[in-house]
Amino acid sequence: MRDERRHMHKALYPYLLFWGIGLLFFAAEWLHPARPIRYRSLFWRDLLALGLYNLSFLVVVRVTDRIPIPDYFPAAFYSLPTVCKLCLFYLVEDFGLYWVHRLMHTKPVWRIHQWHHSPPYLYWLAGIRATVPHIILFNLTYILALPLLHEASSWAFQVIMVEHIIRNNWMHMNVTWRSSWLEWVFVTPRYHHIHHSKHPAHHRANLGALLTIWDRLFGTYYNPNDVKGELSFGLNERVSPVRLVIGV
């Protein structure tokens, strides 16, 4: 009985964490909204998108977990402290995420990513829209970076899970908060919202997922302080909802 409860708590923990963080972010949006939002017109659609995402993610994880990834580092590397391994993991994963995201904004691959850009308003749950191919490509970067955590302490994986949940919700939040100094290193809502803008100059800008350094190094950086006027979001074309969800 105890084992069953333990397994149940372990299975429910990510969902409880997701909604706990979501409620905090919703409170922040209510107190300091960047733009007025009609939550009722969006929330139920995004709840459905969340359900589809969870089902798709579970399937993708089951499949990709079977991919054999060799330990491609010298044996001496695995004696490094867990903190060092975790930092290296994030550098490799985030570098991969940047290039996968950049690939998704090319014509041949755009269809699998455009659902993510379809919300007309951005708020903490808006970033959950993702097709199955979208999830697969982003999950591959995690898998390729995973050998860096070989023999790492278990707490490192807890940190990654919590950070991944916070990150996606955080960067899409509808808040007025800004910090130019933080944006020198990390992606913020203000920074990422530019990427979701309908403006052609913004569409392939600020592609970073966690760190802003890749945008600065590879020519896709757009300074949030240079934005003139209000941003508008959504797609510049009408696409069938079915095609959006499937990614074709």
Regions of interest found by a model, annotated:
Residues 12-74, 78-98:
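Specific transmembrane helices
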Residues 229-248:
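A membrane-cytosol interface segment of integral membrane proteins
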Residues 51-60, 80-232:
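Membrane-embedded catalytic scaffold of the fatty acid hydroxylase/desaturase
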Residues 2-7:
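Short, Lys/Arg-enriched N-terminal segments with co-localized hydrophobic residues
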Residues 22-23, 30, 47, 209-220, ...:
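A transmembrane-helix-recognition feature enriched in membrane-embedded lipid enzymes
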